């Protein structure tokens, strides 16, 4: 019976550690994704400003 308690405790502990590591990794991925989105938005805003500066008939060569 003591062996079963230790085994169960070990399984639960390792599961908890695994879940916390996955949550941490997920948070990092979310942070990276939001940073990429912000950079993309900034880049798109810059492109829109460039388009406003050019006359509509202007074609780059």
From Swiss-Prot:
- Which intervals carry biased composition (Basic and acidic residues)? 36-55
Tissues showing expression: Expressed by the skin glands.
Region span, Disordered: 25-61
Annotated compartments: Secreted
One of the GO biological process terms: defense response
InterPro entries tied to this protein: Frog_antimicrobial_propeptide
Residue ranges annotated as propeptide in the record? 23-53
Where, per the database record, does this protein carry 4-hydroxyproline?
56
Keywords from UniProt, A to Z, are: Amphibian defense peptide, Hydroxylation, Secreted, Signal
Q: Where is the signal peptide?
A: 1-22
Entries under Pfam families matching the protein: FSAP_sig_propep
Which GO terms of the cellular component aspect does the record hold? extracellular region
- Protein family: Belongs to the frog skin active peptide (FSAP) family. Tryptophillin subfamily.
This protein's name = Tryptophyllin-T1
């Amino acid at each position: 019976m003591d062996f079963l308690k230790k085994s169960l405790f070990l399984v639960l502990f390792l599961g908890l550690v695994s879940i916390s590591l996955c949550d941490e990794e997920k948070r990092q991925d979310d942070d990276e994704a939001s940073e990429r989105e912000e950079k993309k938005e900034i880049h798109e805003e810059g492109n829109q400003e460039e388009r406003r500066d050019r006359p509509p008939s202007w074609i780059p060569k």
